[in-house]
Amino acid sequence: MAKTAIQTSQENQPVIQVENVSKLFRTPNEGAISALQSVSLNISHGEFITVVGPSGCGKSTLLKLIAGFSPPSSGRILCQNEEVRGLNTKVGYVPQESKLFPWLTVEENVGFGLDSKRYPREKREHQVQQFINLAGLAGFEKYYPAQLSGGMSKRASIIRALAYEPAVILMDEPFGPLDAQTRMVLQDELLKIWEQKRQTIVFVTHDLVEAVALADRVVVITHRPGQIKDIINVSMKRPRNIFEIHRQEGFDEAYGRLWNIFRHELNIGMH
């Protein structure tokens, strides 16, 4: 089906606009701590953005501001051209911990976010099953979180955020606690789901290989107070083979540039 002029115009508009945003935290002992300073960033419809930077640089803070968990101290954030004021219901949020509801089954957890959409029962069941199948969890619909492995819990947590199809998915180091092999499998599955659904993803990670492997663009944040140091365009073609990512044309160039920038920030943080 051909896209209308309105649809094309909407897709060309940034889905997220971060405009000169700063964030201060006040502590009893240290006074005001500047977590982010003068951050501006536009994120397009369907983009996969990864965010990297030294520990404590404000990566997670940026996600929480976009999610509306707390307001910026100055500047503003827009989601689909509307300023974020309070909880942003247009985004899905995947934290580092799976945080599935232990009293709900896999299919109930995945369908939880759909309740607010008031889907007819048949459509709701189809949507839940579609994402369960995409995540390789078919056959585990009736399992409870305590019966799942760490990797399976993470899959369920991710598709719970994806299933109600928010405009943007915010992912805060979702694969951090997992072993290397499970991480690669989940990276591959995430990319396959994203290729089909093309939801906008903003993905925080401390893993530079992961950052390059997944992203259209990598945003590098400086040591605190966090500012955008650079944005690296990743020219690797899609679809990508996570299991042979080091051999893919464009990987070495993007990774080398990212490492040089990141190494400089680490050196600054140590002085």
What are the language-model segments listed below?
Residues 11-15, 24-38:
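A short, flexible loop at the N-terminus of ABC-type nucleotide-binding domains that lies
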Residues 52-54:
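The feature captures the beta-strand-to-loop junction immediately N-terminal to the Walker
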Residues 67:
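Helix-to-loop junction immediately C-terminal to a conserved catalytic motif
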Residues 75-87:
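Conserved ABC transporter NBD signature motif
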Residues 104-111:
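Short coil-to-helix segment of the ABC ATPase nucleotide-binding domain corresponding to the Q-loop/switch region
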Residues 111, 115, 122-140, 192:
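Conserved ABC ATPase "signature" region
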Residues 144-148, 152:
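Conserved ABC ATPase signature
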Residues 163-167:
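A short, proline-enriched helix->beta-strand linker immediately N-terminal to the Walker B motif
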